[in-house]
């Protein structure tokens, strides 16, 4: 899996995890507000525009605005599955 696909997978899993916490409508609505990603109706990330690290951080930030530390704790295990995906430059 190439790097962009890994970032899309990580972000899609984050959205899925937030769907459980916030409900699918709210989780997808918040994700669609992130300008550097495109989200399918099913909540999957279909495109990353620009830097994937910035896109990932923007997605995380949009959920942190709502739920704070709970979000950070809930997505931690996702990053264990994708050791090559970085959150910062």
Per-region residue spans from a language model:
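Long, compositionally biased intrinsically disordered regulatory segments in eukaryotic proteins
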Residues: 1-89
């Amino acid at each position: 899996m190439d790097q962009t696909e890994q970032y899309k997978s990580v972000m899609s899993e984050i959205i899925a995890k937030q769907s459980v916490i916030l409900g699918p409508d709210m989780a997808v609505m918040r994700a669609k507000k992130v300008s550097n990603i495109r989200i399918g109706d099913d909540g999957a990330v279909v495109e990353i525009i620009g830097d994937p690290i910035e896109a990932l951080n923007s997605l995380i930030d949009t959920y942190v605005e709502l739920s704070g530390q709970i979000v950070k704790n809930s997505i931690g295990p996702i990053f264990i599955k994708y050791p090559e995906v970085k959150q910062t430059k």
